[in-house]
């Protein structure tokens, strides 16, 4: 055979071998590529599935009904025009002219501060202020001025008709031109005024706490239900975006079984500890001290409970009929008028938990604490911790409070599979030992050190706050909510819901049943502290019983 023929014969064989080798090599390469594509596709699909699992629906506050501008104008009376009374009337659309002046100047100096703009764009509730009642003349006159500020004007504005001042709240309740009342008096008057308002057929917006004594708690509930009036309890957190999102997270079981919840109060400011300034015009002539002392029946209930249980050390020490400006302006510091940390601040935390999880009244409460920082003669503790047990839910809720440290702590819901922290924002992190998400954690689809869900409503629109109290509520998401991208004061939304239920029917989101559950819970915590023993709830008899 010639060399030429040999070459021609060998080349195809060589090419065949090279081709075979290429084929043999290319098979696993293509297979690896295909497998890689498959794995990537599967990973992406699992990521999407996880995303779908944790996707939350848009939230709408209960108040997000259309205002009825052509409906009946609701005629309002306000009882109590202290710190919270001012805030409530302002939220309803009737601000003090001096506040409008301040907001306008703030907006001029700081264009990013939108508080004045938001307030002026707030829809009218179609209400009028017909009557005001406060036992301090200066506050009563300020309430009249605010109630006549129908156009939200500054000090140089044109005002409307002045509401009538009533020196006794029962006279206001008897007025034919008042449909509904906002009650923002001191704690020891809440129950009595709410009962009388309901029996007078007036719709009620009641500030917390619902009651000062345990016996009146039942009377309030019965009076509201029997009268059929529209009752809204004060918790504007019912309108808060992050709380509504948190409720969805619980309903979707994203956290798994929740066995422990921690809630707290942290303040570090005299104002936050109820050491309020004493007004320069306050004296025995401008204050009706006799009315301030309280309703005789309620006072008898209070004194009877204290005496029967050996708690006389918590009464006084000043005589109840002795005029005292400190006790008038700083009444929260004494059990003689106050419900303490449980009635004033635990109530917000408990209502948030009850709104989100529907826990109801706890089975038991155990408390401890004391007056550890503010040695100013107060009888109400400035440090308190209470453990509430819900055995039917396999759940404990811990409340801890100090008025001498502002270390920020949110509400923490601890589940087997994930934990949720809730304040002005919401964060969910998966537990590294989660059973439900173990496979996704192993695959790197879920990373325990990275938030699974983060929700920050209106993050870019945060204005300065003007007091320790406002800062406290801002940190808890209780100042603003967002409806269709527009920022609203949550108290405005809460009053708006109440007004629309009066006008068109319906039950407000924080109704008498929610208020009753909260009142009993707070009383259990308070009695546990005062008596130094665990308190239990007999749900069949509806009674607080001692351990």
Q: PLM ranges: what are they?
A:
Residues 192, 212-215, 219, 490-497:
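Generic alpha-helical secondary structure signal
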Residues 2-17, 21-200, 218-230:
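N-terminal glycine-/serine-/threonine-rich beta1-alpha1-beta2 phosphate-ribose binding loop
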Residues 178-182, 198-270:
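Hydrophobic, small-residue-rich alpha-helical packing segments that form membrane-like cores
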Residues 21, 85, 89, 93, ...:
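Non-transmembrane alpha-helical segments in soluble domains
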Residues 77-79, 130-134, 182-183, 205-206, ...:
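Structural recognition of the beta-strand scaffold that forms the well-ordered cores
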Residues 30, 55-57, 244-245, 254-513, ...:
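Contiguous beta-strand/loop segments that form the cofactor/metal-binding neighborhood of enzyme cores
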Residues 165, 190, 239-242, 491:
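Conserved donor sugar-nucleotide recognition element shared by glycan-biosynthetic enzymes
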Residues 80-83, 136-137, 186-187, 210, ...:
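Short, flexible loop/turn elements at secondary-structure junctions
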